[in-house]
Amino acid sequence: LLLATWHDLSDVTLAEALDERASFRRFCGFAAHEPTPERTAFVRSRRELVTRGLDRVRFDAVTRQLEAKGVMVRTGTLVDATLIRSASIRHDGEAKWAGHRRRKPTHGDTAQVATDRAAVLIRGVEVTTATVHDAAELEAVLPSQPGDVYGGDRRSAAGPSAFAGRSTEAVIRARGGPPQVVRSGTWGRPEALVRLQAHNAAVRRIRCRIETVFGTCKRCHGLRRMRWLGLAKAGLQVRLAAMACTLRRSVTLPHAAAA
């Protein structure tokens, strides 16, 4: 399933690639004479992963392994959310319509993501319907001792900026990390406005790194839209993409190569 995510393959093309490509066989541990799975095996595997919640277990295992090897360095955390189109407007009853500022409304789900600041590797991910507030799963995606937490300034379907409220900042402080979020306004003299603008610019300059993760997952790992129906399978797809993106990015890091 990771190979399918890395190469954006359907079940049929993945089965064909496993049968024909020696590199795919070696990666999956198949000998040259062994039969490889048919496409129906991937359908059953996904069903088992979703039913037993093993997609979360696998994602957490990857995160722990990278932390143990020193690839993920706790120098701060970036949090944000991105909207992903549903597989079908007509048949996906769990996905919802959501608009974002002046953009065209989208029928889909939201991936709420936390990454480390230094390497921008994904440390936490949750999937909700598109109408859920961007910071609704903040407590679930934030790691313990996250350091400075940089929140996005994207406005959610609920209206206000997602990470600038008292409740979300309380969640961040409870985890031991000071919030570094974009502020929407201030009272006082012009000097106060200048300080506010400088603060927001500094936060955006760091927070924008998480956009590269969203872009990579959508461009290279099949998250331009959901492949399967339902929120549970959407969560599986997003976690597979998160693992694929994190593993591929981790091998290019200088300290990972040194280790």
Residue ranges and their predicted role:
Residues 12:
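Residues within the helices of the helix-turn-helix
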Residues 6-7, 15-19, 28-175, 184, ...:
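Polybasic low-complexity intrinsically disordered regions
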Residues 147, 153-156, 161-239:
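Helix-centered, glycine/charged polyanion-binding patches within enzymatic domains
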Residues 126-127, 169, 228-232, 254-259:
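Composition- and surface-driven signal marking solvent-exposed, interaction-prone regions
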Residues 197, 220, 248-259:
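A short, flexible helix-boundary coil/loop motif
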